[in-house]
Amino acid sequence: MQLSPQEKDKLLIFTAALLAERRKNRGIKLNYPEAIAYISAAILEGAREGRSVAELMSYGTTLLTREEVMEGIPEMITEVQIEATFPDGTKLVTVHNPIH
């Protein structure tokens, strides 16, 4: 199977997000890379579903709470940027202050 670097990146994000989701469901607080992957994967999937950039920017702030991540993580993650594939092309989605 031949994958482009972008496809490999998306698979890595998905794998990390799957691990993060499992840990979150077990009540384990997420660390920095897990939180980034969890939010990024949700944005990528939302784009594939046809949601707009504005919708995803808002949606990204509802995915994790302070109680679901390790101490200090909300302050470390001031924004998440991910290039997502939409029906009309690739766009950069930025989620500001995603963890409340």
UniProtKB/Swiss-Prot annotation:
The entry's keywords: Cytoplasm, Hydrolase
Top enzyme category: hydrolase
UniProt cross-references to Pfam families, sorted A to Z: Urease_gamma
A GO CC annotation given for this chain: cytoplasm
One GO molecular-function entry: urease activity
Disulfide bonds: none
Reactions mediated catalytically: urea + 2 H2O + H(+) = hydrogencarbonate + 2 NH4(+)
Primary location group: cytoplasm
UniProt pathway annotation: Nitrogen metabolism; urea degradation; CO(2) and NH(3) from urea (urease route): step 1/1
Gene Ontology annotations of biological process type: urea catabolic process
Keyword presence, Hydrolase: yes
Tree of life domain: Bacteria
Subcellular location: Cytoplasm
Known EC number: 3.5.1.5
Transmembrane segments: none
NCBIfam families: PRK13241.1, urease_gam
Oligomeric and partner information: Heterotrimer of UreA (gamma), UreB (beta) and UreC (alpha) subunits. Three heterotrimers associate to form the active enzyme.
Protein family per UniProt: Belongs to the urease gamma subunit family.
Protein name: Urease subunit gamma
Species in which this protein is naturally found: Microcystis aeruginosa (strain NIES-843 / IAM M-2473)
